[in-house]
Every structure is written in C-alpha cells, then in structure tokens.
Swiss-Prot record:
Annotated GO MF terms: DNA-binding transcription factor activity, RNA polymerase II-specific; RNA polymerase II cis-regulatory region sequence-specific DNA binding
Residue stretches of biased makeup (Polar residues): 67-90, 108-121
Origin species: Branchiostoma floridae (Florida lancelet)
Pfam family, one: Homeodomain
Keywords: Developmental protein, DNA-binding, Homeobox, Nucleus, Transcription, Transcription regulation
Composition bias type Pro residues, residue spans: 211-231, 299-309, 344-354
Chief place where the protein resides: nucleus
Designated name of the protein: Homeobox protein HOX3
Biased composition (Low complexity): 235-251
Length: 411
C-alpha cells in the first residue's frame, strides 16, 4: 500500500483537468482484505481513464459491491465521435454550396485569360502568344541573316508592296506583320538620322562649299555698291558706280586741313562749266591717252612748300606708305593715273587776289618729257616713277596761269 500515494501524485500531475474527489477515487473498496487489492486496481484504472470505458457500469473488482462513480458511467466522447465522423463530414459538404470564386487562383486566372485574349486577334501563321492588341506582344528577336536581308531591301525600297512582303515573309520565315512593323520602325529611324545630319552640318556646309569673297576695306561713311562676281566682266554701269564712289571719297579728302587751300578760289568761279578737279580723273573708264591725261590734270598750285596735289581717289600722305598702295591693297588703274607729283614752283605773290592775267589765261600747258608721252596700258600697278609724270613748271609772274582745259566731249 506504499505505492498508492505515488500514483495519486502522478495522476494529479498528469491529469489536472480530470481531478476526482476522495469519495469517487475509493468507491470500489471492498470490506475484506481483498478490498485493499481491489482498491488498488480501481485506483489505477480510474487514474488512467481509458480503462473505465472498457468496464461495464455494474461490474466491480474483487467481487465486492460498491458505489459506481459517475465518471465511469459516462461514455468516452472520442469513441462516440469516431464512428460518426464520416457521416458528419459528408453532411457538411452536402450542405455547403461552392461558388466559382472559391475555385479561383492567380495561376488559373492567367491560364484562362490568355487564350481568350488571343482568340480572334491573331493573323494566319502567327502564334497565339504573340498577338492581341489588348495583350502585350512579345519582342521579336531577328537573326543576323534576317537583318541583313531586311536592310538590303530597305536600301532599295523603303516601302514594301504586299506581294514583296509576302515573298520576304516566306523567305525569312517571318510573318507579314513582323516585316511591316520592322519597316515602319526603320523608316522612323532613317528620318531621325536625316534630321540630325541636316541640322548639325547645315550651317557649316554652306561656308565650306561656297568660296568666300575677298575682304575689302572702305572708309567710314561710304556705302560701297554690290561687288561684281569674279567670273563676270564689269559692265559700264558698274564702272560708273565705282567712279561715283571714288569721287565721293575724293571730296571727303578735300576737306582735310592740309589740302584745304587747293585749288585757288578764283579758279573755281572762273570755270563754271568744268567739273571739279578732284573728280575729273575719276570719270575715265577705259585706256588713258596722253591727250586725255593732259586735259584732265589740275593747275599747279603756287606754293613754296612741296605738297602733292590731291588729284585722285587716294592721295598719298607724307606719313602713309607707298603711293601705289592704299590701306594695304593695290591701287586701281584710275587711282594710279590720277596721282601726280609736281615740282615746287618759284616763290611769287599770294594767289588769293585776282592777278592781271586772270581773264586772259593765254598760256599753254608745259611740255612733257619725251620718254613719258605714252602711257602703257599694262603697267597700271607700277611704281610712281613710271606712272606719275614730272612737269617742269616755270611760273615767272602772277599772270602766268595755265590755260583752261577744253570740254570732255568723248565721255
């Protein structure tokens, strides 16, 4: 009987939820000595409850009679449910209604939607996975041989007709739609390349192909006329325009203080029909003859200081460069011819007042040296020693004035 406390403690620890009172625990005790053994067996079987379900409710151990505990009278609920489980599951499945959304899954919905979208939108010869305006079309991977053939065809013809498209589709193992889309993309790429090429090289191509005209320097305040083309001959009107511009520049130089005293004022009002001396040598537009040259020069100013007479377009200043070079450019034939150099005359009375020979003017021009009678036509850009003629003017009195030049009727 020493083991009974041990079993009581272990039974309480293992089955805390099934704690029994003392009256229930010892309900099977007998009156005799065998009752001790019976109480031991009953105690063990009550502690480990599955043995109670095997016994009958009215049976006792050791032949003794005792009170039957209510726990042993109860049947095991697990044994009752074990037989009725299949029946209850079948009844639950039969009573519940299964809706379509219960069977839906993400993978099943994708598999069911893909055939529905591709039906009715694919072309002949195209797989269902490629087509469909609503679905995403797969990217076509072209081989190098296909790209070479497509590029060759695009080089010769940028727009394909239907028979040629069918022929290329059969030859390259592609669909008509793939070839059509490739040509559309290739045309857009070609337009973009042409636009970039035209915008980048448009500004520099014009300057590289067209020759630039030579740079010319003009004095401030003068508006030069249109320059003639290098391959065309200058016309008469262009030469007249050039002579007018040169005469305007000569009139600008007339206002300089160093040359403001030439020509004398009494000669200006005495010859009203003659053009100004600065513009006489500028109206010639052809070969210059000695007679024309002699008739166009202005009278020698009676001055004691050696100053060149401003006759032409560009008169060389003492601080300027050579007389045949103006502003770094070679002088024109008209400029070189109009430039003359005179020797200083003998000192005499002041030319401001009218002299006794003012109305007569019977003296003739001085003679030129014999080696300067002819003016070569091909040496327009030669130095001043060849073109400019040196005159020996011998003015003895105030009345010795140069005769007026005749009218120029050939111009």
């Amino acid at each position: 009987m020493q083991k009974s406390p041990y079993y009581e403690t272990t039974s309480q620890q293992l089955y805390n939820g099934y704690s029994y009172s003392n009256g229930e625990r010892f309900g099977y005790e007998g009156s005799g000595g065998g009752g001790g053994g019976g109480s031991y067996g009953a105690e063990v079987t009550q502690d480990f409850g599955p043995s109670c379900s095997v016994r009958k409710p009215g049976s006792t151990t050791g032949g003794g009679t005792g009170n039957v505990s209510p726990t042993c009278m109860k049947t095991n609920p697990a044994d009752n449910n074990h037989g009725s489980a299949p029946q209850s599951n079948a009844s639950i499945l039969a009573n519940t209604k299964i809706y379509p959304w219960m069977k839906e899954s993400r993978q099943n919905s994708k598999q069911r939607q893909q055939p529905n979208l591709s039906v009715g939108t694919t072309e002949p010869g195209e797989s269902p996975g490629l087509g469909g305006a609503a679905g995403k079309r797969a990217r076509t991977a072209y081989t190098s041989a296909q790209l070479v053939e497509l590029e060759k065809e695009f080089h010769f013809n940028r727009y394909l007709c239907r028979p040629r498209r069918v022929e290329m589709a059969a030859m390259l193992n592609l669909t008509e739609r793939q070839i059509k889309i490739w040509f559309q993309n290739r045309r857009m790429k070609y337009k973009k390349e042409q636009k970039v090429k035209g915008g980048g090289s448009g500004g520099g191509s014009g300057g590289m192909n067209s020759p630039s005209p030579p740079a010319t320097t003009t004095p401030p305040g003068i508006n030069p006329g249109p320059l003639p083309h290098p391959t065309t001959q200058p016309s008469l009107s262009q030469s007249n325009n050039m002579s007018n511009h040169m005469s305007m520049m000569g009139s600008l130089q007339q206002t300089q203080p160093a040359y403001s005293q030439y020509p004398p004022p009494h000669l200006n009002h005495s010859l009203p029909h003659q053009a100004p001396p600065h513009s006489v040598g500028l109206t010639m537009s052809g070969p210059v003859s000695p007679q024309c040259y002699q008739s166009n020069h202005s009278p020698c100013p009676p001055s004691s200081a050696p100053h060149p007479v401003p006759m032409g377009n560009h008169v060389p200043h003492p601080r300027q460069g050579p007389p045949h070079m103006t502003n770094g450019l070679p002088a024109s034939p008209l400029e070189v011819v109009s430039q003359r150099q005179y020797t200083p005359p003998a000192p005499g009375p002041s030319p401001t007042g009218p002299g006794p020979g003012h109305h007569g003017l019977t003296n003739s021009y001085p003679e030129c040296p014999p080696h300067h009678t002819e003016l070569p036509h091909h040496q327009y850009s030669t130095p001043m020693s060849v073109v400019n003629m040196n005159y020996c003017v011998n003015v003895q009195t105030q009345g010795n004035r140069l005769n007026s030049a005749p009218k120029l009727t050939h111009l």
